[in-house]
């Protein structure tokens, strides 16, 4: 609502807080915490993306730094699998692990889960990277009154380096 009423600064803060809440919800919990937390974080980040055009240079820089820290706090899929395994062991004992093995017809019942969580983790990290690039591009636009040609144009003044895509490892390009 803030964004539609012309208060993009407040909308960006609220959207960042929603993303922060989502990331905090993923910390140390089992699979359901990770799924709900990443969905909430994704929602906040998508809203933040819509608010970038109305931000100042200072606000863009501040959000870039906050996003760097927030992305680093996100639990890895391995940590989530460890928490899920511990939760099953605590609630169902060894029997729970055997049931998971039986249901999945495998000796590695958590492997499919780890693969799905890795995809979700990479997707969310890609959004974090896109946002940092968009914020750097907005700073570039405001300071130089030009559109950046590529991500390389933003390095080193606006980004530390060209950020790789979390899934492919190839350098990210300017989001459209």
Q: Which sequence ranges carry the predicted segments?
A:
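Short acidic linear motifs
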Residues: 1-176
């Amino acid at each position: 609502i803030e964004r539609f009423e012309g208060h993009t600064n407040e909308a960006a803060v609220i959207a960042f807080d929603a993303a922060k809440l989502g990331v905090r919800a993923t910390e140390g919990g089992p699979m359901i915490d990770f799924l709900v937390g990443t969905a909430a974080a994704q929602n906040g980040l998508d809203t933040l993306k819509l608010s970038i055009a109305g931000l100042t240079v200072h606000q863009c820089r501040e959000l870039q730094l906050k996003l760097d820290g927030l992305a680093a706090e996100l639990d890895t899929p391995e940590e989530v699998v460890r928490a899920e395994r511990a939760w099953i062991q605590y609630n169902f004992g060894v029997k729970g692990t055997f049931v998971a093995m039986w249901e999945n017809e495998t000796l590695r019942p958590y492997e499919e889960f780890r693969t799905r969580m890795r995809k979700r983790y990479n997707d969310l990290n890609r959004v974090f990277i896109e946002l940092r690039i968009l914020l750097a591009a907005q700073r570039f636009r405001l300071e130089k009154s030009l559109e950046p040609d590529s991500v390389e144009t933003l390095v080193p003044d606006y980004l530390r380096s060209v950020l790789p895509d979390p899934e492919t490892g190839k350098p990210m390009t300017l989001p459209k």
